From Swiss-Prot:
GO biological process: branching involved in blood vessel morphogenesis; cell differentiation; cell fate determination; endothelial cell morphogenesis; epithelial to mesenchymal transition; hemopoiesis; luteolysis; mammary gland development
Source organism of the structure: Homo sapiens
Record protein name field: Neurogenic locus notch homolog protein 4
Residue windows of the LNR repeats: 1170-1213, 1214-1250, 1251-1294
Sequence ranges of the ANK repeats: 1633-1665, 1666-1698, 1700-1732, 1733-1765, 1766-1798
Function field: Functions as a receptor for membrane-bound ligands Jagged1, Jagged2 and Delta1 to regulate cell-fate determination. Upon ligand activation through the released notch intracellular domain (NICD) it forms a transcriptional activator complex with RBPJ/RBPSUH and activates genes of the enhancer of split locus. Affects the implementation of differentiation, proliferation and apoptotic programs. May regulate branching morphogenesis in the developing vascular system.
Glycosylation sites: 664, 714, 964, 1143
Protein family per UniProt: Belongs to the NOTCH family.
Keyword Disulfide bond: yes
Domain EGF-like: 24-63, 64-115, 118-155, 156-192, 194-232, 234-274, 276-312, 314-353, 355-391, 392-430, 432-473, 475-511, 513-549, 551-587, 589-625, 626-659, 661-689, 691-727, 729-765, 767-803, 806-842, 844-880, 882-928, 930-966, 968-1004, 1006-1044, 1046-1085, 1087-1126, 1130-1171
Disulfide bonds: 28-41, 35-51, 53-62, 68-80, 74-103, 105-114, 122-133, 127-143, 145-154, 160-171, 165-180, 182-191, 198-211, 205-220, 222-231, 238-249, 243-262, 264-273, 280-291, 285-300, 302-311, 318-332, 326-341, 343-352, 359-370, 364-379, 381-390, 396-407, 401-418, 420-429, 436-452, 446-461, 463-472, 479-490, 484-499, 501-510, 517-528, 522-537, 539-548, 555-566, 560-575, 577-586, 593-604, 598-613, 615-624, 629-640, 634-649, 651-658, 665-672, 667-677, 679-688, 695-706, 700-715, 717-726, 733-744, 738-753, 755-764, 771-782, 776-791, 793-802, 810-821, 815-830, 832-841, 848-859, 853-868, 870-879, 886-907, 901-916, 918-927, 934-945, 939-954, 956-965, 972-983, 977-992, 994-1003, 1010-1023, 1015-1032, 1034-1043, 1050-1061, 1055-1073, 1075-1084, 1091-1102, 1096-1114, 1116-1125, 1134-1146, 1140-1159, 1161-1170, 1178-1191, 1187-1203, 1214-1238, 1220-1233, 1229-1245, 1251-1277, 1259-1272, 1268-1284
Classification via InterPro entries: Ankyrin_rpt, Ankyrin_rpt-contain_sf, EGF-like_Ca-bd_dom, EGF-like_CS, EGF-like_dom, EGF-type_Asp/Asn_hydroxyl_site, EGF_Ca-bd_CS, Growth_fac_rcpt_cys_sf
Gene Ontology CC terms: cell surface; cytosol; endoplasmic reticulum membrane; extracellular region; Golgi membrane; nucleoplasm; nucleus; plasma membrane
Parts of the chain that traverse the membrane: 1448-1468
Organismal lineage: Eukaryota, Metazoa, Chordata, Craniata, Vertebrata
Length: 2003
């Protein structure tokens, strides 16, 4: 090669390298300019740039015009969006080379340009046929786009859907381009280029090493002695000097410390940290910034015009401080790196500093002068010329216009133009304009109804009263004349005013001082003295107080002497003296001897208040009137002798005796004479016991003075003593020192007073000052009153304590400077006088600031006015008159002298100046202003002044008259007195005489009658003042006008239910009710607690306490708690709150009762709920029948057995050191606890497989139905409820368990058999509900709750309806029906015990009880059961129980009697032979059982697939598990599915009454219950059981076809037709499942009915209770014809979702329904829809190995790598479930193998865990696997769920269906398995669709005799879901041989009917399930598939079947 050629080649290579390394993007400053169409290039980092396009252009280089520039492009308010062409290299359809546009239309419009009005918000083309449209809540349509499309109307390609980014790049959709976020090591638009790290500067490897580039990374080739990714490790120990620059040396232990590493500080690198790298190598300094290297960083030194860390921020020069950049008003505009000035007109230059000469280009006319101005010019015209350019002739020289008009020249035509003065018109403005005449054709110029008066050049308005102004536009301010009295506020009103008077003044003008004494405020005849704004009361003696209302108690000072009693009187007192005293104060003693009361000869002795006669000898008595020896005083023969003032009767011998026997009376101070006492002097009384005069014996002690009384005496005690005889020492309280109602309390040193709240002080003499605490707010003044206080509020506040803000008004006088106030809704408004402003007119205006004076003067303000100081040469008020004569002034203005002054004014020379003498009505320096005659305010007393042409007119306020309203009229004329007061005129006003009850100047005030306290104090609650009256509100127990009458509160009989009423004064109601037994409450209206101290609400059960002395308790239902069952149910499971105490961790479990929990506890808290042992207070609560969770533990015998079903120690016999109670049922095996004594560790050590999912629901539905289901007769399936027990081996009385459960009757009906099955599965023994001799379930109400119940009653669906009514309604507290039931269950223990060592289960009932007690103790039993289990009683079955149940809750005698009767019934029942023919049929309420006339074989249908749709096509009890494909179906809550029994070949369609014969179908009588009247038309929508209508029954029974329903409907074709024609409702739905007739037509595959229902308006999108639409039901039932009908309906929502989010497409993919997946995709079903677990239809197809559906979904755009909520892909599910075909399909399309789920598992990992070796080989890339399956050794060879072929010798254990089995080796079968659902071949080729036993009683069709072809030429595959035939052994005309021994009995396989009525049988051909027989080799069931002659293909052991 020649050297020039070599040189040329090198040059080409260099150019190529430069082009390769050149960065992508634009380079600003290159040639040519990169930005087109005026775009600006902006530099970015790394030298790249971007174009900022000018308006109207777009694109990367602004190369495209913006189509949205046209504002009319999108019509009707649509928004326009420009769409750029797709970039090159993207996977998109061919796009145009010019941009397009997209119009986003408003709701209601559509079209490419939104030009069409849209009736339907979602037209078919709205989403561009690439998505589905649905309407949002706001009414706007919204599109759900298909994969690969995006945008509001799915019009944009989603370029990221194809994942264009390679090498792990993440695609970011930025339309119309994409952006790939590349991982480290890759770059490029699609991350397609590998970054060569070795070319970087500096390189990644240190000096002295070699760099080798790798894909996405690099590798450093280290010399000897260095190692590490970057050769950073050096051999040898750390050098003594260490590492440079502060680095840390660290030995590498993983290299045996033979290498060391320097850890460098920031800013240094290198093996020894010796290098400071240049950080400026890759700096990002922009815009000319200089990089300055630093330590581990760099700094950008920016030029002056840029700032920021990378000099990328522009400095805004326009905002910098300093002198402005732009002068002369120029505007500064910032730009990138600079600025520029936008100058105003006339200026130029960089900073607008140059003044441009505008006269250079001016065009002024010749002869004119141009004058330059700023930004303009002006032309100075010569005389006679005018115009802007002086180009027009001045037409005004001849003065053609009126003198007051303005003349100008028209700039266009050059003619004269007159601008008229106001009020004139015409060409020359000489014509007067009649404004009032114009008002007749339009609005009047005078407002508010003013009258218009035309004047020359103007008009005047005659205003109505109250208005003023030139146009009556202003409200006249009547307050301008200041009519109100000084100190008051004038309120301006419309045509009047109102004076707001201050306190103390009144009257219309506030001119009258208020007489506060007019209302007679002073009491007790006091004199009132009027004050200003107040009064003073001059009290009479004896009264005090502000109003003399307090009567002074003159008796306080004890003014009465000598024991006189003081009586207080108003203003005085009165002394009631004792006898013997007199005087005003009883101070004078009366001398009773002055009147000589004693007879002559007797001496009078004066005594205090009495006298005493000293009788002479021989006389006695008070007045000495009785002789001592009176006649007949002595007896005969006795002699009367007077001895010492005493008469003695002496016997003849001189001795006193000889008294007769009858004189034996007792005389104290006298002698007995003739049986009566003759008293001594001074004594009296029957026995002379009373001292006459009293004082003779000196009874008064301590020197007291005695005063005799008629009945005794009275002692006047000296100071310090008191009492009747002065014997008591007087205390300090005796004198009553406490005043004002205070109570006196003696004390050792004297006394102390307890004062009432109204007074205080040592003697309660001072009124309490309530104002001390300042209770008034907002500046209010506190006024103290007796016992209370009041607040006088400041201005603007109100309320009892002035706490409320008062809306301001003119009453607050807010206006200042004599302004006028006007009230308005917004508050007061002040009308300010001239010169003032502000809200309150408080601010003096600066009048000179408005420049009222011209430039030739100075303004000087004085107060609210101003005047002008004229400069030399000017004069006038405004200095606008030149200082010249009239002649000169007119000449200077070019007018006549007569026109100098306006309005006819006369110009008068005055010295050097002149002035205008104005005519009347005008003013001003030139007479230019009209004079306002009202300006001087001539009208008085609030009158309104109205200007008139000739003066003014005053409109007077009411009460005034005269020219200026100065004359006052009669003040009473306006009737100012209110409330019928009498008005009397007086000078200056009036006087109102008020009637009683009213006060005030105008009698406007109502007297508060309650001030005098008229109500009775003890019976009054409150006094209410009324208008001139009052009302007393009485306390309970009082009545009357003044509440003075007491009433009997018991008179109205307030006590209910026979309660006794007792009146009490202290109770709140005034009475107390003594209630009878059973009632309580204040009025005995509440029923007493029925359970001890509590009511059992919400169906709770009352249980007696087994512990003596403890009250009964409530056992609550449905999760309620608390002593009364009122506590709402707490969250089940783990809460919150967590049920585990002391930081225990909680895990949830499942069961019938909802989620349960299991606690994992720390060692210090080992209880079931992590409670600590030995809790306080547990001893007292142990054994009380209530489980206390805190006391439950082995230490306290599980709360004395309360928490363990009454068993104190369930683990009795288990070694205590093993702590097995703590390990029981914790999910882990503990060998030390795996024994019978330790209850088998709760079966944790063995986990046999659960019941096959396909059989679990079937076994649930057929549990204990009287038929042996061999596939269900396993421990994991519940032993079939004991149906398979041997007939002959049962004892007469078998083992049993009696359970006490708390369930409501409806719940018991629904959950009874579920309860038995759950316990059977839990205990692993056979359990069933026993029946009595009449075949009824042995279920009895709990005797303790309803003792009156008879044991004959059993479980009854109408239990609640038949309950006996209450004899007395109890309102809301009526207890619900009994929730407690005793359920007796039989137990099959034949497979347990020592005889069966392989079976580990409890072998006696006692062990069962211990096992259940242990589960209850650890909390594992409650969540498994539907309700609480309170007690269990086992019975071994050897003899009937003789005693009552030995548990605490059944301890009453009634319970014992009942249980004895229960035992007798059990014995009689078990003696009889058990019937095996059929199970008991329970019919729902409303159905009646038709009596059987003849026996018939029983038929039922076995399960046919794991989806179990055929078992019960109703709402599933359990939703589809997220990880499985099993969709268990069953009855709805509250729904039972019965089995209709077949009675031979059916001839009728049995409905509600199950009676034969359709009758006359058009009348629809057979479809409705009995009508009330035969004449009434039948109700076509009558509801039957579960809400079933006749239309539903007709759809269920089906359409008439050949071979189907022989004799159905008695020849009546299509039974729904007459119903729909008669108006039957097609939208009705059942109560339980919510299914409509269209649902039933889909479920039973009735295409004719479905079509007819759609025509009748049935809603195809109506969901049932599970959210399923008819399309869901049709897909699930494989009703293809119905599916096609629904898909053809435009109303059908193909993407409707159930409650779990399942769409019909997901259901079809999951159930492998043939062809429906493709049909749904063709109907635009969303292939990317997700359910609530995040799974798509492709996930479900992969999970069930539906390769056909998966292929169709992938072809429709399904995402092959979609991840669900657990981040599992379809490939992951295929690997987990062993779906080889789907996995091959996905791997062939490049599905990601390494995507992991949340647990970090990849598809290969889960395939390895599940032993799917064939899939593992696929995933590891070894190619497609062969048909093989490696069996792993183990117990029974382990499960093989995916064998491809079936061996005849290998049956599934238990029969049933084996989901997805592919290979079964000989002798190795899955336990609990069944028929293979995914096998590619089957033994018998039956009809695929529309026939078989699974098509709901329809006939089989299309089955070729002898195994001929099926309809449509298809061969039925077991992999198909939906209705599929069984491998049945057929006979009859189909030539099918018997299966078991050559014959199949029709009695063996009774038909299982659906819930909605009994349909006719498909035919008389029995369809048995797989024949299951025991295997003699392995003891497991075998699959007997009939003779091989009928098989279409041989089944080879270990190989594929060939067709």
């Amino acid at each position: 090669m020649q050297p020039p050629s070599l040189l040329l080649l090198l040059l080409l290579l260099l150019l190529l390298c430069v082009s390769v390394v050149r960065p992508r993007g634009l380079l600003c400053g290159s040639f040519p300019e990169p930005c087109a169409n005026g775009g600006t290039c902006l530099s970015l980092s790394l030298g790249q740039g971007t174009c900022q396009c000018a308006p109207g252009f777009l694109g990367e280089t602004c190369q495209f015009p913006d189509p949205c520039q046209n504002a009319q492009l999108c019509q009707n308010g649509g928004s326009c969006q420009a769409l750029l062409p797709a970039p090159l290299g993207l996977p998109s359809s061919p796009s145009p080379l010019t941009p397009s546009f997209l119009c986003t239309c408003l709701p209601g419009f559509t079209g490419e340009r939104c030009q069409a009005k849209l009736e339907d918000p979602c037209p078919p083309s709205f989403c561009s046929k690439r998505g589905r449209c649905h309407i949002q809540a706001s009414g706007r349509p919204q599109c759900s786009c298909m994969p690969g499309w995006t945008g509001e109307q799915c019009q944009l390609r989603d370029f990221c859907s194809a994942n264009p980014c390679v090498n792990g790049g993440v695609c970011l959709a930025t339309y119309p381009q994409i952006q790939c976020h590349c991982p480290p090591g890759f770059e490029g638009h699609a991350c397609e280029r590998d970054v060569n790290e070795c070319f970087q500067d500096p390189g990644p490897c240190p000096k002295g090493t070699s760099c080798h580039n790798t894909l996405g990374s690099f590798q450093c080739l280290c010399p000897v002695g260095q190692e590490g990714p970057r050769c950073e490790l050096r051999a040898g120990p750390c050098p003594p000097r260490g590492c440079s620059n502060g680095g840390t040396c660290q030995l590498m232990p993983e290299k045996d410390s033979t290498f060391h590493l320097c850890l460098c500080p920031p800013g240094f690198i290198g093996p020894d940290c010796e290098v400071n790298p240049d950080n400026c190598v890759s700096h990002q300094c922009q815009n000319g910034g200089t990089c300055q290297d630093g330590l581990d960083t760099y700094t950008c030194l920016c030029p002056e015009t840029w700032t920021g860390w990378d000099c990328s921020e522009d400095v805004d020069e326009c905002e910098t401080q300093g002198p402005p950049h732009c002068r002369n008003g120029g505007t500064c505009q910032n730009s990138a790196g600079s600025f520029h000035c936008v100058c105003v007109s006339g200026w130029g230059g960089t900073s607008c500093e140059e003044n441009l000469d505008d006269c250079i280009a001016a065009t002024c006319a010749p002869g004119s002068t141009c004058i330059d101005r700023v930004g303009s010019f002006s032309c100075l015209c010569p005389p006679g010329r005018t115009g802007l350019l002086c180009h027009l002739e001045d037409m005004c020289l001849s003065q053609p216009c009126h003198g007051d008009a303005q003349c100008s020249t028209n700039p266009l035509t050059g003619s004269t133009l007159c601008l008229c003065q106001p009020g004139y018109s015409g060409p020359t403005c000489h014509q007067d304009l009649d404004e009032c005449l114009m008002a007749q054709q339009g609005p009047s110029p005078c407002e508010h109804g003013g009258s218009c008066l035309n004047t020359p050049g103007s008009f005047n308005c005659l205003c109505p009263p109250g208005y003023t102004g030139s146009r009556c536009e202003a409200d006249h301010n009547e307050c301008l004349s200041q009519p109100c009295h000084p100190g008051s506020t004038c309120l301006d009103l419309l045509a009047t005013f109102h004076c707001l008077c201050p306190p103390g003044l009144e009257g219309q003008l506030c001119e009258v001082e208020t007489n506060e004494c007019a209302s007679a405020p002073c009491l007790n005849h006091a004199d009132c003295h009027d004050l200003l704004n107040g009064f003073q009361c001059i009290c009479l003696p004896g009264f005090s107080g502000t109003r003399c209302e307090e009567d002074i108690d003159e008796c306080r000072s004890s003014p009465c002497a000598n024991g006189g009693q003081c009586q207080d009187q108003p203003g005085a007192f009165h002394c009631k003296c004792l006898p013997g005293f007199e005087g005003p104060r009883c101070q004078t003693e009366v001398d009773e001897c002055l009147s000589d009361p004693c007879p002559v000869g007797a001496s009078c002795l004066d005594l205090p208040g009495a006298f005493f006669c000293l009788c002479p000898s021989g006389f006695t008595g008070q007045l000495c009137e009785v002789p001592l020896c009176a006649p007949n005083l002595c007896q005969p023969k006795q002699i009367c002798k007077d001895q010492k003032d005493k008469a003695n009767c002496l016997c003849p011998d001189g001795s006193p005796g000889c008294a007769p026997p009858e004189d034996n009376c007792t005389c104290h101070h006298g002698h007995c004479q003739r049986s009566s006492c003759v008293c001594d002097v001074g004594w009296t009384g029957p026995e002379c016991e009373a001292e006459l005069g009293g004082c003779i014996s000196a009874p008064c002690a301590h020197g007291g003075t005695c005063y005799p009384q008629p009945s005794g005496y009275n002692c006047t005690c000296p100071t310090g003593y008191t009492g009747p005889t002065c014997s008591e020492e007087m205390t300090a309280c005796h004198s009553g020192p406490c005043l004002n109602g205070g109570s006196c309390n003696p004390s050792p040193g004297g006394y102390y007073c307890t004062c009432p709240p109204s007074h205080t002080g040592p003697q309660c003499q001072t009124s309490t000052d309530y104002c001390v605490s300042a209770p008034c707010f907002n500046g209010g003044t506190c006024v103290n009153r007796p016992g209370t206080f009041s607040c006088l509020c400041a201005m603007g506040f109100q309320g009892p304590r002035c706490e409320g803000k008062l809306r301001p008004s003119c009453a607050d006088s807010p206006c200042r400077n004599r302004a006028t106030c006007q009230d308005s809704p917004q508050g007061p408004r002040c009308l300010c006088p001239t010169g003032y402003t502000g809200g309150s007119c408080q601010t003096l205006m600066d009048l000179c600031a408005q420049k009222p004076c011209p430039r030739n003067s100075h303004c000087l303000q004085t107060g609210p006015s101003f005047h002008c100081l004229c400069l030399q040469g000017w004069t006038g008020p405004l200095c606008n008159l030149p200082l010249s004569s009239c002649q000169k002034a007119a000449l200077s203005q070019g007018i006549d002298v007569s026109s100098l002054c306006h309005n006819g004014g006369l110009c008068v020379d005055s010295g050097p100046s002149y002035f205008c003498h104005c005519p009347p009505g005008f003013q001003g320096s030139l007479c230019q202003d009209h004079v306002n005659p009202c300006e001087s305010r001539p009208c008085q007393n609030g009158a309104t002044c109205m200007a008139q042409p000739s003066g003014y007119l005053c409109q007077c306020a009411p009460g005034y008259d005269g020219q200026n309203c100065s004359k006052e009229l009669d003040a009473c004329q306006s009737q100012p007195c209110h409330n019928h007061g009498t008005c009397t005129p007086k000078p200056g006003g009036f006087h109102c005489a008020c009637p009683p009850g009213f006060v005030g100047l105008r009698c406007e005030g109502d007297v508060d009658e309650c001030l005098d306290q008229p109500c009775h104090p003890t019976g009054t609650a409150a006094c209410h003042s009324l208008a001139n009256a009052f009302y007393c509100q009485c306390l309970p127990g009082h009545t009357g006008q003044w509440c003075e009458v007491e009433i009997d509160p018991c008179h109205s009989q307030p006590c209910f239910h026979g309660g006794t009423c007792e009146a009490t004064a202290g109770s709140p109601l005034g009475f107390i009710c003594h209630c009878p037994k059973g009632f309580e409450g204040p009025t005995c209206s509440h029923r007493a607690p029925s359970c001890g101290f509590h009511h059992c609400h919400h169906g709770g059960l009352c249980l007696p306490s087994p512990k003596p002395g403890f009250p009964p308790r409530c056992a609550c239902l449905s999760g309620y708690g608390g002593p009364d069952c009122l506590t709402p149910p707490a969250p089940k499971g783990c809460g919150p709150p967590s049920p585990c105490l002391y930081n225990g961790s909680c895990s949830e479990t499942t069961g019938l009762g909802g989620p349960g929990f299991r606690c994992s506890c720390p060692h210090s808290s080992p209880g079931p709920r992590c409670q600590k042992p030995g809790a306080k207070g547990c001893e007292g609560r142990s054994g009380d029948g209530a489980c206390d969770a805190g006391c439950s533990g082995p230490g306290g015998n599980w709360d004395g057995g309360d928490c363990s079903l009454g068993v104190p120690d369930p683990w009795k016999g288990c070694p205590s050191h093993s702590r097995c109670w703590l390990l029981f049922r914790d999910g882990q095996c503990h060998p030390q606890c795996d024994s019978e004594e330790c209850l088998f560790d709760g079966y944790d050590c063995e986990t046999p497989p659960a019941c096959t999912p396909a059989y679990d629901q079937y076994c649930h539905d057929h549990f204990h139905n009287g038929h042996c289901e061999k596939g269900c007769n396993t421990a994991e399936c519940g032993w079939d409820g004991g149906d398979c027990r041997p007939e002959d081996g049962d004892p007469e009385w078998g083992p049993s368990l009696a359970l006490l459960v708390v369930l409501s009757p409806p719940a018991l009906d629904q959950q009874l058999f579920a309860l038995a099955r759950v316990l059977s599965l839990t205990l692993r023994v056979g359990l069933w509900v026993r029946k009595d001799r009449d075949g009824r379930d042995m279920v009895y109400p709990y005797p303790g709750a309803r003792a009156e119940e008879k044991l004959g009653g059993t479980r009854d669906p109408t239990y609640q309806e038949r309950a006996a009514p209450q004899t007395q309604p109890l309102g809301k507290e009526t207890d619900s029906l009994s929730a407690g039931f005793v359920v007796v269950m039989g137990v099959d223990l034949s497979r347990c015990g020592p005889d069966h060592p392989a079976s580990r289960c409890p072998w006696d009932p006692g062990l069962l009880l211990r096992f259940l007690a242990a589960m209850a103790a650890v909390g594992a039993l409650e969540p498994l059961l539907p309700g609480p289990l309170l007690a269990v009683h086992p019975h071994a079955g050897t003899a009937p129980p003789a005693n009552q149940l030995p548990w605490p809750v059944l301890c009453s005698p009634v319970a014992g009697v009942i249980l004895l009767a229960l035992g007798a019934l059990l014995v009689l029942q078990l003696i009889r032979r058990r019937r095996r023919e059929h199970g008991a049929l329970w019919l729902p309420p409303g159905f009646t059982r038709r009596p059987r006339t003849q026996s018939a074989p029983h038929r039922r249908r076995p399960p046919l697939g794991e989806d179990s749709i055929g078992l019960k096509a109703l709402k599933p009890k359990a939703e589809v598990d997220e990880d499985g494909v099993v969709m268990c179906s069953g009855p709805e809550e509250g729904e039972e599915v019965g089995q209709a029994e077949e009675t031979g070949p059916p001839s009728t369609c049995q409905l509600w009454s199950l009676s034969g014969g359709c009758g006359a179908l058009p009348q629809a009588a057979m479809l409705t219950p009995p009508q009330e009247s035969e004449m009434e038309a039948p109700d076509l929508d009558t509801r039957g059981p579960d809400g079933v209508t006749p239309l539903m029954s007709a759809v269920c029974c089906g359409e008439v076809q050949s071979g189907t329903f022989q004799g159905a409907w008695l020849g009546c074709p299509e039974p729904w037709e007459p119903l729909l024609d008669g108006g039957a409702c097609p939208q009705a739905h059942t109560v339980g499942t919510g299914e409509t007739p269209l649902h039933l037509a889909a479920r039973f595959s009735r295409p004719t009915a479905a079509r007819r229902l759609l025509e009748a308006g049935a809603n195809p999108n109506q969901p049932d209770r599970a959210g399923r639409t008819p399309l869901h039901a049709a897909v699930a039932a494989d009703a293809r014809e119905v599916c096609q009908l629904l898909l053809r309906s435009r109303q059908t929502a193909v993407d409707a979702r159930t409650e779990d989010g399942t769409t019909p497409l997901m259901l079809a993919a999951r159930l492998a329904v043939e062809d429906l997946v493709e049909e749904l995709i063709a109907a635009q079903a969303d292939v990317g829809a997700r359910d609530k677990w995040g799974k798509t239809a492709l996930h479900w197809a992969a999970a069930v190995n539906n390769a056909r559906a998966a292929r169709s979904l992938l072809q429709a755009g399904a995402d092959k790598d979609a991840q669900d909520n657990r981040e599992q892909t379809p490939l992951f599910l295929a690997a987990r479930e062993g779906a080889v075909e789907v996995a091959q399909l996905l791997l062939g399309l490049g599905a990601a193998r390494e995507l992991r789920d949340q647990a970090g598992l990849a598809p290969a990992d889960v395939a390895h865990q599940r032993n799917h070796w064939d899939l593992l080989t696929l995933l590891e890339g070894a190619g497609p696997p062969e048909a093989r399956h490696k069996a792993t050794p183990g117990r029974e060879a382990g499960p093989f769920p995916r064998a491809r072929t079936v061996s005849v010798s290998v049956p599934p254990h238990g029969g049933g269906a084996l989901p997805r089995c592919r290979t079964l080796s000989a002798g190795a079968g899955p336990r609990g398995g069944g028929a293979c659902l995914q096998a590619r071949t089957w033994s018998v080729d039956l009809a695929a669709r529309g026939g078989g036993a699974y098509s709901h009683c329809r006939s089989l069709s299309g089955v070729g005799a002898g195994g001929g072809p099926t309809p449509r030429g298809r061969r039925f595959s077991a992999g198909m879901r939906g209705p599929r035939p069984n491998p049945a052994i057929m006979r009859g005309r189909y030539g099918v041989a018997a299966g078991r021994g050559g014959r199949v009995s029709t009695d063996d396989w009774p038909c299982d009917w659906v819930a909605l009525g009994a349909c006719g049988s498909a035919s008389n051909i029995p369809i048995p399930p797989p024949c299951l027989t025991p295997s003699p080799e392995r003891g497991s069931p075998q699959l007997d598939c009939g003779p091989p002659a009928l098989q279409e293909m041989p089944i080879n052991q270990g190989g594929e079947g060939k067709k």
